[in-house]
Amino acid sequence: MGAYDGAEAPRAAPASTAANSRPSRLLLLHSLLLRLVAVVLSILVIAVMVHAKQRVMIFKAEWDNSKAFVALVTISAICLGYSFLQFILSAFHLCSKSWKSPTKCWAWMNFIADQILTYAMLGAAAAAAELAYIAKNGSSRAQWQPICSTFNTFCTRAGASIILSFIAVLALANSSAISAYHLFRRPSSSV
């Protein structure tokens, strides 16, 4: 008979905890960097959008005249606060000598918060992009004239802020993917 004559195959020894924690620490480092990127981009989105103002003769265009731009700044501020808090917590966990994987409850909270903020930022960026499109091209059906030829500085700054917000969405989405990995990679016995 062969090597497997009905007897159970020998079981592999469990991997050491140090070997198991290495990928988690590496992912935590990536998450840390992505959250730092999200913080910086959120600051830039807010700073550039808040300075999107222009006056031409008696007319003026300001970012706070539009609910879509106000929503983008508000959501960016919330993402800034959340990403900064997560950055601090991730840095603490990464530098801690007694580092261990987050609990299942903590992983769920991170995953849900990351998902909510990623989609909120995506929605705010999309609404602002639609408004910018109308400002640039107008709307013949609504009989709205394009304003970017008159308010070029305003439109340029608003557009830059919108581009930065979509880049922030990418950073938040990648952070969210790492949160999902931390949550769903766990075996069911660790619930």
From Swiss-Prot:
Record carries keyword Cell membrane:
yes
What are the protein's UniProt keywords? Cell membrane, Glycoprotein, Membrane, Transmembrane, Transmembrane helix
Extracellular topological domain: 47-68, 136-157
Keyword flag Cytoplasm: no
- Family annotation (InterPro entries): CASP/CASPL, CASP_dom
Q: Which GO terms describe its cellular component?
A: plasma membrane
Q: Which residues are glycosylated?
A: N137
The protein's topology relative to the membrane is:
Multi-pass membrane protein
**Transmembrane annotation, as ranges:** 26-46, 69-89, 115-135, 158-178
Kindly list the places in or outside the cell where this protein is found, as annotated in its UniProt entry: Cell membrane
Query: What spans does the record annotate as topological domain Cytoplasmic, numbered to this chain?
Result: 1-25, 90-114, 179-191
Q: Which family does it belong to?
A: Belongs to the Casparian strip membrane proteins (CASP) family.
Self-association and partners: Homodimer and heterodimers.
Q: What is this protein called?
A: CASP-like protein 2U4
